[in-house]
Amino acid sequence: ESSFEFKFIKQLNTKNKEKNLLVSPIGIEIILSLCSNGTEGLTQKEMIKLLKYNTLDETNDNANKIMNELEKNNIVKIANGILTKIRPNEKFVRKGLNDYKSHIDELKNYNNVNKWVMDKTNGKIKKIIDKLSPDVMMVLLNAIYFEAFWKKQFDINHTYIKEFYNIDNSKENVELMFLRGEKLNYYENDDLKAVKLDYNIQDNSINAIAILPKSEQYLEQSINDLIENLDDNLFYNIVENLNKESSITKVNLYLPKYELDFEINLNEILKELGMSKAFERDAEFQGISSKLKLFINKILQKNYINVNEKGTQACSASELEIMLESY
């Protein structure tokens, strides 16, 4: 059984096989966990089940645990926001403040949504929406920001322009950074090769893991197969092997230097994964308001990453719009 993260990535990949994907499943998990506090009945059941939890308490505890774990080194910064035009149920506000450390403010227009996102991503994501329907009563927001240097930095003089094979087997010239004969944690099996790159963080709690299919012949097939087969067991197996002392190997590593952004509307993917009730007109959002008929209008995520010789800068912003059923 795959966790939410891997189920989500696989589903996303089936729809976008030709694209460079950049997503933060954790950002979605946190925003849905926060949102589930505003729901009841089937709406809540589907949301919690999608996240692989059994109860609302378990959902909140885990979201809280994830945030604390990621933020402990001050390398990752996580922010949650509730922008609202209505006065939400007291219990929902309390949960938002206590478990999610949410910033609560008035929802004025789309500019104040974009400003929140821009502030929390250090200006890297300047806007997440172009407009906001007047029927949107509340916007939930999550932002994750990460910046760290490599423990072993790449020498800028060893960055070369080289041919790189795209997924459709076409070639293009890209900047490839190079580490020659460095001792790195390296693992391979019949299907894949994986290498772990450490950031300059005291307890080594955050690393980058690059995974490549072994076969270079049928690149598109190999990459899609690799994603298709990726689940908790395989991933933990890779990580476990990379963490062994015995995995330290002298490696010549070429790593593309790249800057990438990616945005996606998550409505369809989440429906396909079993969370459909929240998007329907008869969704149960009594946890936010017992008087108003509310449902989710859309869930968006926008991501940015910059990988260079010095390190990595990455951020993610997720936006969830709760709308009033208008007759």
Identify what each model region corresponds to.
Residues E1-Y327:
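Secretory/exported precursors with cleavable N-terminal leaders
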